[in-house]
Amino acid sequence: MASTTLSATPTPSQLSAAKNGAYSPSRALLGKTARGLYPEKEMVSRKVTCQATSIPADRVPDMGKRQTMNLLLLGALSLPTAGMLIPYGAFFVPPSSGGGGGGIVAKDAVGNDIVAAAWLKTHGPGDRTLAQGLRGDPTYLVVENDRSLATYGINAVCTHLGCVVPWNKAENKFLCPCHGSQYNNQGKVVRGPAPLSLALSHCDISEEGKVVFVPWVETDFRTGENPWWS
């Protein structure tokens, strides 16, 4: 009968193992039966082991690649915040040709010289709009309530970590979207973490009627102290 063939004659090596207690025909039979009952599990196990041991070394990301991936992920998560600053994007990278010693003609967002009379026709009382100022820094031109141009410009670079601070007309404040710093309508800090008020520059009008920014080196009229930026 077929069942009588299950008891196979042990090999010499198996007989030797049996003397040491490491082999018995019943154990061999059970091992063969188990492998016969679960062939699929054995194949899956072999397949997984094969995949795990066959990954080329150049496909395993090193630390540099992982750091790059983390930075890309951080950038993707930062996109909603960056969207809040799109109207101010033209002022994030100052032009390299900006001078710092003397006065400089103010320029609008597309790089055109700002003419005071034309500016005041399109910007009403209380307006605060960005222009390119000293060293190319984004600087607010301030329109007074009598529709004249204020004699000072307000540097828009936050004194905390350098974000461009938007003007919030409804709040009558400059509100930094990065970390919550606040400045009053003249740029004086009223809430941290920013440690200092926004820098000032003189805002003059040239003989040609153009707006000119000049470094402010006198006492800060908002604090009564020497200007920290000079």
Swiss-Prot record:
Listed as disulfide-bonded, the cysteine pairs are: 163-178
Q: Which Enzyme Commission number(s) are on file for it?
A: 7.1.1.6
Q: Which reaction does it catalyse?
A: 2 oxidized [plastocyanin] + a plastoquinol + 2 H(+)(in) = 2 reduced [plastocyanin] + a plastoquinone + 4 H(+)(out)
What is the protein's membrane topology class? Single-pass membrane protein
Q: List keywords of the entry alphabetically.
A: 2Fe-2S, Chloroplast, Disulfide bond, Electron transport, Iron, Iron-sulfur, Membrane, Metal-binding, Plastid, Thylakoid, Transit peptide, Translocase, Transmembrane, Transmembrane helix, Transport
What SUPFAM superfamilies does this protein's entry cite? ISP domain
Task: List the biased-composition ranges (Low complexity).
Answer: 1-16
Look up the signal peptide feature and give its range: none
Gene Ontology MF: a single term = metal ion binding
Q: Which GO terms describe its cellular component?
A: chloroplast thylakoid membrane
Looking up InterPro entries in the UniProt record yields: Cyt_b6_f_Rieske, Rieske_2Fe-2S, Rieske_2Fe-2S_sf, Rieske_Fe-S_prot, Rieske_Fe-S_prot_C
Q: Where is this region: Disordered?
A: 1-20
Q: Where is the transit peptide?
A: 1-56
Q: Which residues form the Rieske domain?
A: 116-212
- Major enzyme class: translocase
Compartments annotated for it: namely: Plastid, Chloroplast thylakoid membrane
What is the top-level taxon of the source organism? Eukaryota
The note on cofactor binding and number reads: Binds 1 [2Fe-2S] cluster per subunit.
Which family does the similarity line name? Belongs to the Rieske iron-sulfur protein family.
**Subunit comment for this entry?**
The 4 large subunits of the cytochrome b6-f complex are cytochrome b6, subunit IV (17 kDa polypeptide, petD), cytochrome f and the Rieske protein, while the 4 small subunits are petG, petL, petM and petN. The complex functions as a dimer.
Protein purpose: Component of the cytochrome b6-f complex, which mediates electron transfer between photosystem II (PSII) and photosystem I (PSI), cyclic electron flow around PSI, and state transitions.
Something else the entry says is: This protein is 1 of 2 subunits of the cytochrome b6-f complex that are encoded in the nucleus. The Rieske iron-sulfur protein is a high potential 2Fe-2S protein.
NCBIfam families associated with the record? Cytb6fFeSPetC (NF045928), PRK13474.1 (NF010001)
Q: What is this protein called?
A: Cytochrome b6-f complex iron-sulfur subunit, chloroplastic
Native organism is: Fritillaria agrestis (Stinkbells)
**Chain's gene name:** petC
